[in-house]
């Protein structure tokens, strides 16, 4: 049986995005189209499926690193700020990602039953979330035609 560790993360997140798009609980709030993903960004994301893609990425991150809190996930989704994109005259500074986007997406994943809050530890994946990840990875492993992944099939 394939697990989420057996397939490339990019492929798994792409497949999870398609799966989570069908969920009623996972949908972008009204403010999401105007919100930047961090203080280092100048514009909001341009992807149409940004919210479900971020939720899929968060589900995988919580499964791999969990239990994990919002602040640790903010550090994961942050980048280095270098001043404006035009000049880049400042030295690199590490910035954190948007906590509101992460928190709201995690709350939606909780409502869908894929993530739960553990006492004083942060959030972790439920059994339903783990089975969704593993089933998606198994389906993806049979679809991928890559010789280096055949040992997992």
Swiss-Prot record:
Protein name, entry field: Small ribosomal subunit protein eS19
Functional note: May be involved in maturation of the 30S ribosomal subunit.
Stored InterPro entries: Ribosomal_eS19 (IPR001266), Ribosomal_eS19_archaeal (IPR027548), Ribosomal_eS19_CS (IPR018277), WH-like_DNA-bd_sf (IPR036388), WH_DNA-bd_sf (IPR036390)
Protein's UniProt keywords contain Ribosomal protein: yes
Source domain of life: Archaea
GO cellular component: cytosolic small ribosomal subunit
HAMAP family the UniProt entry points to: Ribosomal_eS19
Lineage of the organism: Archaea, Methanobacteriati, Methanobacteriota, Stenosarchaea group, Halobacteria
Native source organism of the sequence: Haloarcula marismortui (strain ATCC 43049 / DSM 3752 / JCM 8966 / VKM B-1809) (Halobacterium marismortui)
Quaternary structure and partners: Part of the 30S ribosomal subunit.
Record field: compositional bias (Basic and acidic residues): 120-133
Keywords, in A-Z order: Ribonucleoprotein, Ribosomal protein
Entry GO MF terms: RNA binding; structural constituent of ribosome
Segments of this protein annotated with the region Disordered: 77-99, 113-139
């Amino acid at each position: 049986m394939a697990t989420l560790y057996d397939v490339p993360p990019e492929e798994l997140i792409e497949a999870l995005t398609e799966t989570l798009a069908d969920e009623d609980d996972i949908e972008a709030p009204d403010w999401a189209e105007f919100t930047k993903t961090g203080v280092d960004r100048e514009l909001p994301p341009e992807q149409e499926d940004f919210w479900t893609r971020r939720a899929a990425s968060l589900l995988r991150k919580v499964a791999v690193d969990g239990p994990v809190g919002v602040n640790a996930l903010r550090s994961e989704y942050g980048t280095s700020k270098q001043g404006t994109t035009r000049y880049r005259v400042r030295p690199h500074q590490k910035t954190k990602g948007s906590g509101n986007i992460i928190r709201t997406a995690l709350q939606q994943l909780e409502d869908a039953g894929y993530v739960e809050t553990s006492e004083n530890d942060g959030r972790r994946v439920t059994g339903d979330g783990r089975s969704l990840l593993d089933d998606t990875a198994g389906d993806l492993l049979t679809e991928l035609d890559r010789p280096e992944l055949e040992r997992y099939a």
